[in-house]
From Swiss-Prot:
Organism classification: Bacteria, Pseudomonadati, Pseudomonadota, Gammaproteobacteria, Enterobacterales
GO molecular function, one term: 2 iron, 2 sulfur cluster binding
Alphabetical list of CDD domains matching this protein: fer2, flavin_oxioreductase
Pfam families for the chain: FAD_binding_6, Fer2, NAD_binding_1
UniProt keywords, alphabetically: 2Fe-2S, Electron transport, Iron, Iron-sulfur, Metal-binding, NAD, Oxidoreductase, Transport
Organism field: Yersinia pestis
Protein name in UniProt: CDP-6-deoxy-L-threo-D-glycero-4-hexulose-3-dehydrase reductase
Class of the enzyme per the UniProt entry, highest EC level: oxidoreductase
Encoding gene (name): ascD
Top-level taxonomic group: Bacteria
Residues annotated as domain FAD-binding FR-type: 98-197
Length: 329
């Protein structure tokens, strides 16, 4: 069975056999529509069903209002007939192919008790192409976890990852207690549609915890291109000592168009900077977001709260781009 899937407003058409999800069918055809977690948790792949029938698995993301408007999640919906969808399509990703690469652990730096900075070296013949902001799956002993790439494309070709220690986490235990330098690993990627769009709007980057990793990659890429858009970086952590890098402050000092506000959400008597929820700090400084693009990376709770509050403060819904960290299943 071959079913046609037509995308609006791009007019792109691809086929599905009806057994794979709409998202997988699109990616198999090298058609890049919006997605992130691929398991129905984050909602990035939300689309509007214009015509046709789909079989959708249950999910907790879509509201009754979403369903009434014809919204589906392409990562957990399968076509039952020819269908037409209103969904974002990104030709910028058409030249990028997801592959599995061997790599070695070139270096690992532990910062405090719960952050590890990994640098992975690929073979000289393996040239991974990605856009700043995308993520990879790290594969160790047959298990995999998704991590955002923390460095811009280019440089020495290494892949930088920021990993937070998770209590009783199987993968955390491997990374923090078992990994050895030069150990052979594998990565699969790049993946995701989290990248900076090419327009002239000023940018708000919103990061929670190691959600700073893709922000670092995207800002580095903007600096490398001498992009002069106004950039506002807000990075939230529970306490002042949790900030594991000072590079954002260095950017702000060196580049007049880059502005940085670290935000502490917990009880920290030594902290003299911004406090509270990181997205609320944005609204205190920029109460009208109607002329901004927002890129947010962090917990699903942070992403959801930021999206709702930012839209209530003028942000166009299609100007909010996110990559939510969701627990492994």
């Amino acid at each position: 069975m071959s079913l046609n899937v037509k995308l609006h407003p791009s007019g792109i058409i691809f086929t599905s056999d009806g057994t794979s999800t709409i998202l997988d069918a699109a990616l198999d055809s090298n058609i890049h529509i919006e997605y992130s977690c691929k398991d129905g948790t984050c909602g990035s792949c939300k689309a509007i069903l214009i015509s046709g029938e789909v079989d959708s698995a249950e999910n907790t993301f879509l509201t009754e209002e979403d369903v009434a408007k014809g919204a589906i999640l392409t990562c957990c919906s399968k076509a039952k007939s020819d269908i037409e969808l209103d969904v974002n399509y990104y030709p910028e990703l058409s030249h990028i192919q997801k592959k599995t690469y061997p790599c070695k652990l070139d270096s690992i730096e532990f910062i405090g008790e719960d952050i590890a900075i990994l640098s992975l070296r690929l073979p000289p013949t393996a040239k991974i192409q990605y856009l700043a902001g995308q993520y990879i799956d790290l594969i160790i002993n047959g298990q995999r976890r998704s991590y955002s790439i923390a460095n811009a494309p280019g440089g020495n070709g290494n892949i930088e990852l920021h990993v937070r220690k998770v209590v009783n986490g199987v993968f955390s235990n491997i990374i923090f207690n078992e990994l050895k330098l030069q150990q052979l690993l594998r990565i699969e990627g790049p993946q995701g549609t989290f990248f900076v769009r090419e327009d002239n709007l000023p940018i708000v980057f919103l990061a929670g915890g190691t959600g700073f990793a893709p922000v670092k990659s995207m800002v580095e890429a903007l600096i490398n291109k001498n992009d002069q858009r106004q950039v506002h970086i807000y990075w939230g952590m529970p306490a002042g000592h949790n900030f594991y890098s000072d590079i954002a402050n260095e950017w702000a000092i060196k580049h007049p168009n880059i502005h940085y506000v670290p935000v502490v959400s917990g009880d920290d008597s030594t902290w003299t900077g911004a406090t509270g929820f990181v997205h609320q700090a944005v609204l205190e400084d920029i109460p009208d977001l109607s002329l901004f693009n927002v890129y947010a990376c962090g917990s699903l709770a942070m992403i959801t709260a930021a999206r709702n509050d930012f839209i209530n403060h003028g942000l166009a819904e299609n100007k909010f781009f996110s990559d939510a960290f969701v627990p492994s299943k």
